Amino acid sequence: MAIYLPELDPENTLFPKPETALDEPNGLLAFGGDLQPARLLAAYRQGIFPWYSNGEPILWWSPAPRAIFLPNEFKPSKSLRKFYRKSGYQITLNNACHDVIRQCANCRSPEETWITEDMIQAYQTMHNLGHCHSVEVWHQDKLVGGFYGLQIGSVFCGESMFSLADNASKIALWFFCRHFSNQGGTLIDCQVMNNHLESLGALEIPRAPFMQQLHQQRAAIIKPNSFVPQTLKIPIE
């Protein structure tokens, strides 16, 4: 069945309203444009993100419902805390963003991944500009897990995560939630629910309350130096 999909104007960074996104496929909003920083920032500030495969035009999405974490409410299980104490893992922030993005791409087959070379370069540029950030989990100096995403005010828009060792992505999320909440962060956007996110405790909310929170928080200012490269440490009960 044919569908109508707006094409973005290459001369500006305007997007259709998110509520006009298709129901099937869920959230598909527009195509075209580019992955330049101005367009990416305009997209994320409206709850829109790119997601496409090699050989496809750039596709822009704003699905409903939306998967989120509330960082101040993330509670690790007793078993996860016990595992971490014995793991020898070290968790860092913004120490290896390019490697994290590359690992997220490599953990999927070329047919499955949406993290194309153009996407890798675009988010590396966003990192260089101070918008894209990564969390890394290290074991014996080897990168074994982590995730990356964009900060928009007090909202963190998660893009992808990977795990090469037991509980690595769970521990990365736990430490980041604690750090981000302490710095004034209020919301983590996970885009689309999946089994892994659900197992970590992600919630789903309708488009309207998600957009309301995003509009309220996208201009918020969190503490300075929140994303300088650092080792993340929290007291373990």
From Swiss-Prot:
UniProtKB keywords: Acyltransferase, Cytoplasm, Transferase
Pfam families for the chain: Leu_Phe_trans
GO MF assignments: leucyl-tRNA--protein transferase activity
Recorded GO CC terms: cytoplasm
SUPFAM superfamilies on file: Acyl-CoA N-acyltransferases (Nat)
Disulfide bonds: none
Signal peptide per UniProt: none
Subcellular location(s) of the protein: Cytoplasm
Any single biological process term in GO: protein catabolic process
Record protein name field: Leucyl/phenylalanyl-tRNA--protein transferase
Organism from which the protein derives: Photobacterium profundum (strain SS9)
